[in-house]
Amino acid sequence: MGRLTLTKLQKMKRQGEKITMLTAYDASFAALLEAAGVEVLLVGDSLGMVIQGQESTLSVTMDDMVYHCRNVSRGSQCTFILSDMPFMSYATPNQAMDNAARLMREGGAQMVKLEGGRLLGEIVEHLTARGIPVCAHLGLLPQSVHRIGGYRVQGREEISARRIQEDAMILQEAGADMLILECVPARLGSKITDALKIPVISCGAGPYCDGQVLVLYDMLGISPGKSPSFSRNFLEGTSNIPNAIQAYVSAVKKNEFPLLELSY
């Protein structure tokens, strides 16, 4: 049995089956997540904060991402592996291609994720034309935290919401095969999910998207500092980590997480 494919994830969207995704950074947790039925492992540059103790994701390097992606690949057999491309690793089409190829060839990633809107259209086209699947990332962009003035909800104003939706359509047209929406109002998450053919995964974008993703350490209630308001500590009330992961998967599949009243 091989790894879950992009074709299967697209089929899940069409059939209305929720996609479960969690971040993973090492082989041991990758194995636990796979055993619990998580479909997608996101090797996130959030490792800069939860693994390395940095204040943001900006210091994470390509070598860091390849290292952790390789470990996650070794620890899993069937899950789909998505890897972040770190800050300034995709400034030009050729740089993006070289770095994405490293993540796939050396790290075992099946797809790479880029943060940003319509200006990334050329880079998305460049990658997908060369057989590299791309996940777009809109809404709150952690790699742009200094430009936007902190970790704030995006798309609350009509102009901002319209631009995010337009960006989503443009990136889909450019070839993106998946989209993560972070910290936007639930109504905007619903609107974009309905408008796109590709799977849309919510990270604080409400319950109406095609799937959900959380930072693993937030989901277990062990992240340093305060977890996002839309998150939930699934370890609370369960006896161990495997049960907490299974509770997350079950809650997403049954539309019991996230709660609309805790969405933006």
Curated annotation (Swiss-Prot):
Which InterPro entries does the UniProt entry name for this protein?
Answer: Pantoate_hydroxy_MeTrfase, Pyrv/PenolPyrv_kinase-like_dom, Pyrv_kinase-like_dom_sf
The source's domain of life comes to Bacteria
**Binding of 3-methyl-2-oxobutanoate, residues:** D45, S46, D84, K113
Under catalytic activity, the entry for this protein gives:
3-methyl-2-oxobutanoate + (6R)-5,10-methylene-5,6,7,8-tetrahydrofolate + H2O = 2-dehydropantoate + (6S)-5,6,7,8-tetrahydrofolate
Q: What is its main location?
A: cytoplasm
Q: What class of enzyme is it?
A: transferase
**What Enzyme Commission number(s) does the record list for this chain?**
2.1.2.11
Family matches, as Pfam families: Pantoate_transf
Its keywords, alphabetically, are: Cytoplasm, Magnesium, Metal-binding, Pantothenate biosynthesis, Transferase
Q: What does the record note about the cofactor? A: Binds 1 Mg(2+) ion per subunit.
Binding locations of Mg(2+): D45, D84, E115
Q: Where is this protein localized, as stated in its record?
A: Cytoplasm
Where does the signal peptide begin and end? none
Q: How does it assemble?
A: Homodecamer; pentamer of dimers.
The cross-references to NCBIfam families, in alphabetical order and at most eight, read:
panB (TIGR00222), PRK00311.1 (NF001452)
Question: What role does this protein play?
Answer: Catalyzes the reversible reaction in which hydroxymethyl group from 5,10-methylenetetrahydrofolate is transferred onto alpha-ketoisovalerate to form ketopantoate.
Family (UniProt): Belongs to the PanB family.
For this entry, the protein name equals 3-methyl-2-oxobutanoate hydroxymethyltransferase
State the species of origin. Nitrosococcus oceani (strain ATCC 19707 / BCRC 17464 / JCM 30415 / NCIMB 11848 / C-107)
